Design a protein with these regions (language model features):
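Basic- and hydrophobic-enriched, low-structure N-terminal and domain-boundary segments
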Residues: 1-162
């Protein structure tokens, strides 16, 4: 897959074993719960699930945005566009080689393949599968639609709810 961004680790918002953030282009369509992959040490891959997507500009405050719009004129046109990016926060859900240290600053972030999504969500480990539905990731040419299975022993039989 193509690179969609890079990991950001700052003094105020470091990467941890539980969370990481990355920047991406402001026109890239992502959704909460999409799965992303970060290249990590020992040629491993860390999987993250998107929790929050924010947009940030170089504006120091909301007041600066108001002033640059001719003091609140919604019809005013800006002479220059602000520099902006999308800032994405992810929850770490695993690593393919059991490497559990924070992902590093500047590492590339990718959309996950179908195989990587199954691995990240544990869908490749379901025993006694019975179809339960589908999960859809991404939009456009990157769209992935995957079947979701449940372990049939937990729906019916002695392990099931009574």
């Amino acid at each position: 897959m193509d690179t969609i961004g890079k990991v950001i680790a700052t003094e105020k918002q470091p990467s941890t074993i539980e969370n990481f953030t990355f920047w991406t282009k402001k026109d890239l369509k992502l959704k909460p719960f999409d799965v992303v992959v970060v290249e990590h040490i020992n040629n491993s891959k860390t999987f993250g699930v998107i929790e929050e997507i924010s947009h940030m500009t170089d504006s120091p405050s909301a007041l600066a945005g108001f002033i640059s719009s001719d003091f609140g004129d919604v019809e005013s046109k800006s002479y220059t566009d602000r520099i902006g990016m999308n800032y994405v926060r992810c929850k770490v859900v695993g690593n393919d080689k059991d490497v559990y240290i924070p992902v590093q600053e500047g590492k590339k972030v990718y959309l996950a393949t179908a195989v990587e999504i199954k691995m990240a969500l544990g869908l490749d480990q379901v025993k006694n599968p019975i179809p339960a539905g589908y999960i859809k990731m991404y939009e456009g040419t990157n769209e992935q639609i995957l079947p979701v299975n449940f372990n049939s022993h937990f729906l019916i039989g002695p392990e099931g709810a009574h």
